[in-house]
Amino acid sequence: MEPVTASTTATAKPTLRVAAFCGSLRKDSWHRGLIRAAEELCEESIPGLRIDHVDISGLPMANPDLETDGGEGFPPAVEALRDRVRAADCFLFASPEYNYSVTASLKNALDWASGGRRNCWADRAAAIVSAGGDFGGGRGSFHLRQIGVFLDLHFINKPELHIRAFADPPKFDDEGNLIDGETRERLKKVLLSLHAFALRLQQHKED
Protein backbone atom coordinates (compact mmCIF):
# COMPACT_ATOMS: atom_id res chain seq x y z
CA MET A 1 0.00 0.00 0.00
CA GLU A 2 1.32 3.43 -0.95
CA PRO A 3 2.01 5.61 2.11
CA VAL A 4 -0.13 8.70 2.60
CA THR A 5 1.91 11.79 1.68
CA ALA A 6 1.15 15.33 0.62
CA SER A 7 1.83 14.39 -2.99
CA THR A 8 -0.44 11.34 -3.05
CA THR A 9 -3.40 13.11 -1.44
CA ALA A 10 -3.15 16.53 -3.02
CA THR A 11 -2.10 15.92 -6.63
CA ALA A 12 -4.73 17.21 -9.06
CA LYS A 13 -7.20 17.64 -6.22
CA PRO A 14 -9.03 20.83 -5.24
CA THR A 15 -7.86 22.74 -2.21
CA LEU A 16 -10.03 21.93 0.78
CA ARG A 17 -11.02 24.60 3.29
CA VAL A 18 -10.41 23.55 6.90
CA ALA A 19 -12.40 25.57 9.42
CA ALA A 20 -10.19 25.54 12.54
CA PHE A 21 -11.54 26.19 16.03
CA CYS A 22 -9.51 26.94 19.15
CA GLY A 23 -11.33 25.97 22.33
CA SER A 24 -9.24 28.35 24.43
CA LEU A 25 -9.82 32.11 24.41
CA ARG A 26 -6.41 32.82 25.96
CA LYS A 27 -4.14 34.87 23.66
CA ASP A 28 -1.02 32.74 24.23
CA SER A 29 -2.85 29.42 24.31
CA TRP A 30 -0.98 26.33 23.16
CA HIS A 31 -4.04 25.48 21.10
CA ARG A 32 -3.86 28.73 19.19
CA GLY A 33 -0.23 27.81 18.59
CA LEU A 34 -1.31 24.46 17.16
CA ILE A 35 -3.61 26.19 14.69
CA ARG A 36 -0.82 28.57 13.67
CA ALA A 37 1.47 25.59 13.14
CA ALA A 38 -1.21 23.88 11.06
CA GLU A 39 -1.49 27.01 8.90
CA GLU A 40 2.27 27.02 8.37
CA LEU A 41 2.39 23.31 7.53
CA CYS A 42 -0.36 23.64 4.95
CA GLU A 43 1.36 26.61 3.32
CA GLU A 44 4.74 24.83 3.31
CA SER A 45 3.95 21.25 2.36
CA ILE A 46 0.23 20.40 2.09
CA PRO A 47 -1.07 22.36 -0.91
CA GLY A 48 -4.43 20.58 -0.81
CA LEU A 49 -5.46 22.18 2.50
CA ARG A 50 -6.10 25.76 3.57
CA ILE A 51 -6.70 26.63 7.23
CA ASP A 52 -9.47 29.12 8.04
CA HIS A 53 -9.17 30.01 11.74
CA VAL A 54 -12.66 30.86 13.02
CA ASP A 55 -12.61 33.18 16.05
CA ILE A 56 -15.37 32.19 18.49
CA SER A 57 -14.56 34.70 21.23
CA GLY A 58 -17.32 37.15 20.27
CA LEU A 59 -20.23 34.73 20.28
CA PRO A 60 -23.08 35.32 22.72
CA MET A 61 -24.01 32.43 24.96
CA ALA A 62 -26.35 30.02 23.20
CA ASN A 63 -29.94 31.08 23.86
CA PRO A 64 -32.92 30.08 21.70
CA ASP A 65 -34.59 33.38 22.63
CA LEU A 66 -32.04 35.09 20.37
CA GLU A 67 -33.22 33.11 17.34
CA THR A 68 -35.71 34.71 14.96
CA ASP A 69 -37.86 33.67 12.01
CA GLY A 70 -38.67 30.29 13.49
CA GLY A 71 -35.06 29.22 13.86
CA GLU A 72 -33.84 30.71 10.57
CA GLY A 73 -32.41 33.96 11.95
CA PHE A 74 -29.56 34.49 14.41
CA PRO A 75 -27.49 37.33 15.90
CA PRO A 76 -24.88 38.68 13.43
CA ALA A 77 -21.90 36.96 15.11
CA VAL A 78 -23.77 33.66 15.01
CA GLU A 79 -24.78 34.11 11.37
CA ALA A 80 -21.11 34.71 10.54
CA LEU A 81 -20.11 31.55 12.41
CA ARG A 82 -22.73 29.45 10.65
CA ASP A 83 -21.64 30.81 7.26
CA ARG A 84 -18.01 29.84 7.94
CA VAL A 85 -19.04 26.37 9.10
CA ARG A 86 -21.25 25.79 6.06
CA ALA A 87 -18.45 26.92 3.73
CA ALA A 88 -15.91 24.49 5.19
CA ASP A 89 -14.95 21.17 3.64
CA CYS A 90 -13.71 19.76 6.95
CA PHE A 91 -12.84 20.83 10.49
CA LEU A 92 -9.87 21.00 12.86
CA PHE A 93 -10.56 21.35 16.58
CA ALA A 94 -7.70 22.45 18.84
CA SER A 95 -9.46 21.50 22.03
CA PRO A 96 -8.10 21.86 25.57
CA GLU A 97 -9.41 19.70 28.39
CA TYR A 98 -11.33 21.55 31.11
CA ASN A 99 -12.65 19.34 33.93
CA TYR A 100 -12.49 16.20 31.74
CA SER A 101 -14.52 17.92 29.02
CA VAL A 102 -14.47 20.54 26.28
CA THR A 103 -14.37 24.25 27.06
CA ALA A 104 -17.53 26.30 27.43
CA SER A 105 -16.51 28.50 24.50
CA LEU A 106 -16.13 25.56 22.11
CA LYS A 107 -19.36 23.90 23.25
CA ASN A 108 -21.11 27.23 22.73
CA ALA A 109 -19.88 27.37 19.12
CA LEU A 110 -20.92 23.78 18.51
CA ASP A 111 -24.39 24.51 19.86
CA TRP A 112 -24.92 27.70 17.86
CA ALA A 113 -23.88 26.12 14.55
CA SER A 114 -26.14 23.12 15.11
CA GLY A 115 -29.18 25.04 16.34
CA GLY A 116 -32.22 26.35 14.54
CA ARG A 117 -33.54 24.38 11.61
CA ARG A 118 -30.16 23.31 10.20
CA ASN A 119 -27.17 21.53 11.67
CA CYS A 120 -24.30 23.21 9.84
CA TRP A 121 -21.67 20.64 10.92
CA ALA A 122 -23.20 17.55 9.38
CA ASP A 123 -21.52 14.93 7.24
CA ARG A 124 -17.96 16.25 7.07
CA ALA A 125 -14.57 15.06 8.26
CA ALA A 126 -12.95 16.43 11.40
CA ALA A 127 -9.79 16.06 13.46
CA ILE A 128 -8.94 16.89 17.07
CA VAL A 129 -5.60 17.98 18.49
CA SER A 130 -4.98 18.77 22.14
CA ALA A 131 -2.27 19.59 24.66
CA GLY A 132 -2.23 19.29 28.42
CA GLY A 133 -0.82 17.32 31.34
CA ASP A 134 -0.19 13.59 31.62
CA PHE A 135 -3.13 12.69 29.35
CA GLY A 136 -2.40 15.45 26.84
CA GLY A 137 -6.01 16.67 26.90
CA GLY A 138 -7.23 13.28 25.73
CA ARG A 139 -10.23 13.03 28.03
CA GLY A 140 -11.63 16.29 26.68
CA SER A 141 -11.02 15.04 23.14
CA PHE A 142 -12.96 11.87 23.83
CA HIS A 143 -15.89 13.95 25.09
CA LEU A 144 -15.74 16.06 21.92
CA ARG A 145 -15.96 12.87 19.88
CA GLN A 146 -19.10 11.93 21.81
CA ILE A 147 -20.68 15.32 21.07
CA GLY A 148 -19.72 14.92 17.42
CA VAL A 149 -21.80 11.75 17.10
CA PHE A 150 -25.02 13.74 17.40
CA LEU A 151 -23.66 16.49 15.13
CA ASP A 152 -22.96 13.88 12.41
CA LEU A 153 -19.25 14.73 12.33
CA HIS A 154 -16.86 12.07 11.04
CA PHE A 155 -13.64 12.21 13.09
CA ILE A 156 -10.44 10.63 11.88
CA ASN A 157 -9.39 7.85 14.25
CA LYS A 158 -5.66 7.79 13.56
CA PRO A 159 -3.26 9.32 14.15
CA GLU A 160 -4.19 10.94 17.45
CA LEU A 161 -2.34 13.97 18.79
CA HIS A 162 -2.57 14.46 22.56
CA ILE A 163 0.52 16.45 23.53
CA ARG A 164 2.05 16.11 27.00
CA ALA A 165 2.95 19.77 27.09
CA PHE A 166 4.85 19.75 30.39
CA ALA A 167 7.16 16.87 29.46
CA ASP A 168 10.65 17.46 28.06
CA PRO A 169 11.65 18.56 25.52
CA PRO A 170 9.68 21.83 25.57
CA LYS A 171 6.77 21.77 23.15
CA PHE A 172 5.71 25.44 23.19
CA ASP A 173 7.34 28.80 23.85
CA ASP A 174 5.95 31.53 26.11
CA GLU A 175 3.72 32.86 23.31
CA GLY A 176 2.16 29.45 22.72
CA ASN A 177 4.06 28.72 19.50
CA LEU A 178 4.79 25.08 18.72
CA ILE A 179 8.59 24.69 18.81
CA ASP A 180 9.10 20.91 19.00
CA GLY A 181 10.00 19.38 15.64
CA GLU A 182 8.72 15.88 16.43
CA THR A 183 5.35 17.22 17.54
CA ARG A 184 5.18 19.33 14.40
CA GLU A 185 5.66 16.20 12.30
CA ARG A 186 2.90 14.45 14.25
CA LEU A 187 0.60 17.40 13.56
CA LYS A 188 1.44 17.16 9.87
CA LYS A 189 0.39 13.50 9.85
CA VAL A 190 -2.95 14.45 11.42
CA LEU A 191 -3.51 17.03 8.69
CA LEU A 192 -2.62 14.56 5.94
CA SER A 193 -5.03 12.02 7.39
CA LEU A 194 -7.78 14.65 7.61
CA HIS A 195 -7.14 15.64 4.01
CA ALA A 196 -7.33 12.06 2.74
CA PHE A 197 -10.48 11.29 4.75
CA ALA A 198 -12.23 14.48 3.63
CA LEU A 199 -11.50 13.65 0.00
CA ARG A 200 -12.90 10.13 0.45
CA LEU A 201 -16.10 11.50 1.97
CA GLN A 202 -16.50 13.97 -0.88
CA GLN A 203 -15.97 11.22 -3.44
CA HIS A 204 -18.56 9.05 -1.68
CA LYS A 205 -21.10 11.88 -1.88
CA GLU A 206 -20.41 12.33 -5.60
CA ASP A 207 -20.82 8.60 -6.23
Regions from the PLM with identified roles:
Residues 2-14, 154-207:
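Glycine-rich phosphate/pyrophosphate-binding loop and the adjoining helix
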Residues 12-47:
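N-terminal beta1-alpha1 ligand-phosphate binding loop
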Residues 18, 31, 35, 78, ...:
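A general structural signal for well-ordered alpha-helical segments in protein cores
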Residues 43-52, 154:
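A generic structural motif
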Residues 53-73, 169-171:
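N-terminal beta-loop-helix "entrance" segment that forms/cooperates
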Residues 71-152:
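Helix-loop-strand module that forms the ligand-binding subsite of alpha/beta enzymes
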